[in-house]
C-alpha cells in the first residue's frame, strides 16, 4: 500500500491546482475524483487577472491559449439605467488578456499537468471515509472505485478540494465561521454566431446576465435572479425565463442572443448561500469551494480556487521547512480570509438583487479593489518554491 504526503480529494480547479503545485514541489501526492476525466461542469468559465497571472507563473497559460481559448481584452458593464461602461484590459502584472476556458478542457489540463508532475491520479473513485490514527489525526482516505473495490490511501495530510458538497468537509464536520443569506438562481446556455466583445456583465432590474466568449467559437450566456423570481418565471418554461431575465438585465443584449444558434440546451442551477468554513485541522485542510464559497454573480470562483490552492501549497512548504504545521495552516486560513472578506461581503450584497445603478457600481468597485489586493499578494509569492522540488518529508 503506497503512503502519500498528501491526498487531494477533488479533481476540478481547486484539487487539480493543489495537486499540481505540491507534486511539482516534490511531495508524494494522490489525487482522487469521483468523476471521469474530462467531464464538463456548469460554470461561468471566466478567469480574472489573478487566475491568469497564476496560469502564466505555472507555465500553463500557453496550453490554454493553444486550445483555442479566445483572449478577452475588454469588459463591458450594462446597467439598469441604460448606461454601458466599457473597460479595456490594461497590461498589468504580466497579464494583457483574460481567458474563459471550458471546464472539460481546463480541469483536464490541470489534472494532466499534475500527473506530469508525478501525482497519482484516481478517477471514478469516491471517498467513503477518512482514516484516523490513535491521536485522532486524519491519516488519509478510504475510497471505492467504479468496480466497487475499496482503495486505501494513507497520507500525512488530507485535502478536501471537492466543492460545495464536499465529502471531506462533511466527514470532518468543518465549522462554518461565516454564513451568507442570499443566493442566485441561474440559467446557462451556450450559443454560436455571436462574437461578444470581451466579457459582458449586466446588472438590470432585479436580474443579472453575462456573455462570456469561450472555446469552439461559442459564448456562454447566463441569466440570474432570486430563487423566488426564477421559480415564477420557469412555470412558463426555461426559454421564457431565460429571455425574460435577459431583457430585464440588459435589453440591448436580447436580439443578438435570441437570434444566435443554440449550441447546447439550457441548464439551471438553484444556488447555494455563500459560506466560509474553518479550513484546517489535525491532518486535514479545505481548498476552494469546499472551504469558501460565494455566489457566482461576481464570476470569481475559479480564480478563488487557484488562489487558495497556491496559498495552501505555500503553507505546506513552510511546514515541511520547519514552521509548526498548526502555525502554517492558521496563516493559510488568515490570508485566505483577508483576501476573501471584501469579495464575500460585496458579492453577498449583489446577490440580493435589490440594487440601484449607483449601489451596484459601488459594490463592483469594492470587488475590483479586492481583486487588486489579490493580484498584489500573488505577485509577491516566490515562483521558485512551486516550480522546483522544495518538499522535505
Where are these regions (language model features)?
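C-terminal helical "tail/cap" subdomain of flavin- and related membrane-associated enzymes
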Residues: 259, 314-393
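Glycine-rich FAD pyrophosphate-binding loop
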Residues: 9, 23-43
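Predominantly flavin-linked oxidoreductase catalytic cores and closely associated redox partners
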Residues: 113-252
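FAD/FMN-dependent oxidoreductases across multiple families
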Residues: 234-315, 319, 324-326
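N-terminal FAD cofactor-binding segment of flavoenzymes
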Residues: 42-80
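Conserved Rossmann-like nucleotide-cofactor binding loop
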Residues: 14, 37, 165
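Beta1/beta-strand and adjacent pyrophosphate-binding region of the FAD-binding site
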Residues: 1-14
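Short beta-strand to alpha-helix junction loop
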Residues: 92-112, 189, 233-237
